[in-house]
């Protein structure tokens, strides 16, 4: 792992360059909407259970895509561009609450590890949902494939992990607000439009659209296949 790329606004003659490819941006907002939708449908009642499950499958497809894109995607989307060593991460913390603006073209050290953490907890949430039941009408596709003890563990994990996700989302939004207004870094605009100010040499030339669409199609197909291959539940009356 190596340190993230940053630049000093002064003396670098910055101009707007493409940093975030559109597949990364589409992933970000699609994941946010899928999570919001899954939260709403979970609270809305049993009649929304099918939609809730579909959104879970969508989240799995998106997360699998982002993991693969983190290895073969564009420059700043790759994990290798923003995951730093623990030593570098700890040494960067003293700048986190400083108003001094040190722009990173991609994720900074804290943002990089926060990205991995959020992906991880959402992955746990989506996977655990495959094994649980509402005990009335709807079962996850693999609920009948595990013992009652495992299903109960997955259900508890699903509900407890959701509370952790809410805490991380609140922390994430607070951090964005701090960087936006306290450190004067337009992170939301960058994730919407894909552009930041910096030296042209640090920008990306394209979003690698064909590669991204191929990978996402493969990921969605894999998740569909996993669900389709789930064994039929056996009901004992």
PLM regions: where:
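Membrane-embedded alpha-helical bundles that constitute the cytochrome b-like, heme-associated redox core
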Residues: 1-237
């Amino acid at each position: 792992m190596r340190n993230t790329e940053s630049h000093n606004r002064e003396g670098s003659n910055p101009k707007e360059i493409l940093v975030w490819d559109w597949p990364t941006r589409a992933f970000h907002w699609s994941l946010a909407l899928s999570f919001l939708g899954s939260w709403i449908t979970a609270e809305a009642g049993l009649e929304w259970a099918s939609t809730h499950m579909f959104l879970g499958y969508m989240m799995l497809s998106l997360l699998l895509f982002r993991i693969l894109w983190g290895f073969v995607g564009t420059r700043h989307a790759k994990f290798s561009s923003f995951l730093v060593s623990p030593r570098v991460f700890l040494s960067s913390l003293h700048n986190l609450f400083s108003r001094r603006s040190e722009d990173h073209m991609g994720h900074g050290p804290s943002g990089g590890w926060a990205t991995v953490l959020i992906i991880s907890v959402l992955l746990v949430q989506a996977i655990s949902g495959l094994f649980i039941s509402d005990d009335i009408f709807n079962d996850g596709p693999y609920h009948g494939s595990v013992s009652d003890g495992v299903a109960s563990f997955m259900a508890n994990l699903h509900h407890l992990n959701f509370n952790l996700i809410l805490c991380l989302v609140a922390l994430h939004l607070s951090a964005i607000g701090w960087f936006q207004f306290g450190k004067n870094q337009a992170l939301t605009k960058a994730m919407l439009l894909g552009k930041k100010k910096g030296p042209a040499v640090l920008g990306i030339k394209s979003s690698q659209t064909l590669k991204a669409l191929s990978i996402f199609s493969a990921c969605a197909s894999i998740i569909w296949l996993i669900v389709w291959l789930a064994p039929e539940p056996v009901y004992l009356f």
